[in-house]
Amino acid sequence: MTLRPLHDKVILKREEVETRSAGGIVLTGSAATKSTRGKVIAVSTGRLLENGSVQALAVKAGDVVIFNEGYGVKSEKIDGEEVLILSENDILAIVE
């Protein structure tokens, strides 16, 4: 299945990071915190401005980003994999 985001939405896959405790134990499940880093897999055509024009988004497919996981972030399972759908405003930085 292919998703095509609308408005100013971005679809990304969370990048899992291995988390270790201070003693070197690998934390999993509820003991580990979820990563707020992800790889963009699809972006919309842009944000609709008040004057009717469309402003392209700053991120593109393939970018690795750091995002704010808050109220507006939607988690969905597509073809057995979790994807996140969020507004470009929820993206804090592009990792270069």
UniProtKB/Swiss-Prot annotation:
Molecular function terms from GO: ATP binding; metal ion binding; protein folding chaperone; protein-folding chaperone binding; unfolded protein binding
Compartments, as annotated in UniProt: Cytoplasm
UniProt keyword list: Chaperone, Cytoplasm
UniProt cross-references to CDD domains, sorted A to Z: cpn10
Pfam families: Cpn10 (PF00166)
Top-rank taxon, per record: Bacteria
UniProt cross-references to SMART domains, sorted A to Z: Cpn10
Entry GO CC: cytoplasm
BP terms from Gene Ontology: chaperone cofactor-dependent protein refolding
Family: Belongs to the GroES chaperonin family.
HAMAP family per record: CH10
Function summary: Together with the chaperonin GroEL, plays an essential role in assisting protein folding. The GroEL-GroES system forms a nano-cage that allows encapsulation of the non-native substrate proteins and provides a physical environment optimized to promote and accelerate protein folding. GroES binds to the apical surface of the GroEL ring, thereby capping the opening of the GroEL channel.
Subunit structure: Heptamer of 7 subunits arranged in a ring. Interacts with the chaperonin GroEL.
Record-given protein name: Co-chaperonin GroES
Organism: Actinobacillus pleuropneumoniae serotype 3 (strain JL03)
